[in-house]
């Protein structure tokens, strides 16, 4: 897999072009500001007088409605939540599309699963920072960047690579390194990582460890420190140095205990469950479930959020984070 760097990309394809960033959340703000500071012509499309309207104006952007931005722009970069994209696209973006324009995304969900079907003659590309928006902006301002992905679903103009690579350069991704992938690969691996490991698997492991210690009579504060708080130390070591050097940096006791006990926690059954989760992503079952959830106004999701917020680990964590100076009183 080839990695592209700053010297491989040029901004030329975007000169004299207008990029409309649709949405001004964490990624919308970071990507639009970075491209603007790279000398590209950026406008921001938002709901008229919505919460983000004044924020984008305060950041110096040319702000307009989504329809106005889509009409004006050559490249329309959609950065609103996945579950809202198709509805906004159909009502406010699709009528403004003309041959030669480019639709761009930072997640392939709606293109890969067919919720957005672009007309003929329109490029469809993806440029995705592999980092939260605040980090995308901060590292750019520091003169570096975060790694990213690019991919091309439809190359209607025969220069889609030049366009998406210029966007990656403008956002600052090629300063760190850019990998070319596909909409299918980006979408399915991203969803799997979120569900099985990063957001689903890790949080369930932390909760199970915390509850095991508390149920055995240990102080909740001690349980939190040992199963949640210190996780960042280990993740940072892995992030910076890899598994081998993480093991080198922890104590012999931790290394031996971890290596000899870990397979009893994440078992063959765990991996089988991961494979089933991946199948649900690949065959569209998860997507259908998520669409149905939206149709009932996220009732199940709201209930799960409420339950998570009432967990003992949340109450203990809030107190300890305040004690450690990590956040103000919640």
Swiss-Prot record:
Residues that coordinate or bind Mg(2+) 2: 190, 226, 230
Record Pfam families: KARI_C, KARI_N
PANTHER family reported in the protein's UniProt record: KETOL-ACID REDUCTOISOMERASE, MITOCHONDRIAL (PTHR21371:SF1)
Known function: Involved in the biosynthesis of branched-chain amino acids (BCAA). Catalyzes an alkyl-migration followed by a ketol-acid reduction of (S)-2-acetolactate (S2AL) to yield (R)-2,3-dihydroxy-isovalerate. In the isomerase reaction, S2AL is rearranged via a Mg-dependent methyl migration to produce 3-hydroxy-3-methyl-2-ketobutyrate (HMKB). In the reductase reaction, this 2-ketoacid undergoes a metal-dependent reduction by NADPH to yield (R)-2,3-dihydroxy-isovalerate.
PROSITE patterns attached to this UniProt entry: KARI_C, KARI_N
Record-annotated KARI N-terminal Rossmann domain positions: 1-181
Organism: Methanococcus maripaludis (strain C6 / ATCC BAA-1332)
Catalysed transformations (reactions): (2R)-2,3-dihydroxy-3-methylbutanoate + NADP(+) = (2S)-2-acetolactate + NADPH + H(+); (2R,3R)-2,3-dihydroxy-3-methylpentanoate + NADP(+) = (S)-2-ethyl-2-hydroxy-3-oxobutanoate + NADPH + H(+)
UniProt-annotated catalytic positions: 107
Cofactor note: Binds 2 magnesium ions per subunit.
Enzyme class, first EC level, given as a word: oxidoreductase
Cofactor: Mg(2+)
One BP annotation, GO: isoleucine biosynthetic process
Family the entry assigns: Belongs to the ketol-acid reductoisomerase family.
Residues annotated for NADP(+) binding in this entry: 24-27, 47, 52, 82-85, 133
Keyword check for Transferase: no
One GO MF term: NADP binding
Protein name per the record: Ketol-acid reductoisomerase (NADP(+))
Assigned keywords, A-Z: Amino-acid biosynthesis, Branched-chain amino acid biosynthesis, Magnesium, Metal-binding, NADP, Oxidoreductase
InterPro entries: 6-PGluconate_DH-like_C_sf (IPR008927), KARI (IPR013023), KARI_C (IPR000506), KARI_N (IPR013116), KARI_prok (IPR014359), NAD(P)-bd_dom_sf (IPR036291)
Top-rank taxon: Archaea
